[in-house]
Amino acid sequence: MSFEQSRLSRRTLLVASALLPLAGGAAEASAATAGRAKEYYDRAARMAGDDPVLRQLVKALSPGAAIPEVKAPKPLKIFDNVAVVSTGFVSATALLTSGGVILIDALGSPDDAKKIIVPELRSLGVDPSTIKYVVAAHGHSDHFGGAQYLADQYGARVMMAPADWRLVAADRPANAPKRDLDIADGQRLTLGDTTVTFHNTPGHTPGTVSPIFPVRWKGQRHTAMLWGGTNPPTATKDKRTYLASVLAFTARMRQAGVDVELNNHGLCDNGLARMEELRGGSSGAGNPFVIGAPRAQRFMKVMETMMRGRIASDQEASTGTRPAAGSAGPVRSIPDCC
């Protein structure tokens, strides 16, 4: 294992935060006028067009959005070195390295770990005893619920950003893991032949992290990102933090050449449908998770535009302006999911 602190990542986030009033100030200043939120939502929808991945993102970030119950998919290796196991609602992503497994998220409970993660990894030829790290992308129970079970059974180390370790300690939810390793902004974790870079992307929670890592498809190398927390927070100030994270992470993606988009909630980005497309072979020799660098950047631009709309919805509600269609003003996001 080697940890390397990126000198640029924290600076990138701070610069993005500092520039936010300049980049978006004029737009946000006028966002309190009637219909401004709807303009953002309509713009995002136009950018998404008929792209099923982007359209699903628009839906997931729209005011009042809810994740429906769906049947859990069968486990699948979506890349040569990446496996996904899922409850349908939430997924765990296993990075298969020459030195063992880095598991991003651990589903919702010890039972999920015992009855889903362990047997389903085995069904894909992955030995769960080789899980070396469990990374909680953020401090909600649907992401860390099985972490302590894996730590107890296999000696896996559990990683989370300090802000969300504190969140977990304050909330004291069921199945919370014991505090173990902190994730620093820009930190690199190397296991075997794979290095993962973690970026702080606060907003969904104070300590949400989004990793960037190499993947292989039929021997060809690509670069993936996994957005750590999708559901926008309730408070307007936290939505602004989310927006700053989107801007900073977009720059990091561009710098890294990200051409693969992943999410821990597959209904937020058409990920479950893409799993079935890949499983059924309807994508031919291609991989539907390889969306290309320009489309990955457009994905983030859609996210940015939707967040500007959500901020505008809050402002319209606070000034007595009629909220955009489908909005109830400051939307009460589900506090412990997504």
What are these regions (language model features)?
Residues 101, 108-110, 178, 188-190, ...:
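Metallo-beta-lactamase
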Residues 1-8, 12-23:
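N-terminal secretory signal peptides
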Residues 34-46, 111-115, 121-188, 291, ...:
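Active-site HxH/HxHxD metal-binding segment of metal-dependent hydrolases
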Residues 31-100, 110, 338:
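Zn-dependent metallo-beta-lactamase
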Residues 84, 96, 102-104, 132-136, ...:
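Structural recognition of the beta-strand scaffold that forms the well-ordered cores
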Residues 69-124, 210-231:
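Conserved beta-strand hairpin/beta-sheet module of binuclear metal-dependent hydrolase folds
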Residues 25-30:
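Sec/Tat signal peptide C-region and signal peptidase I cleavage site
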Residues 32-36, 44, 296-338:
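C-terminal regulatory/interaction regions
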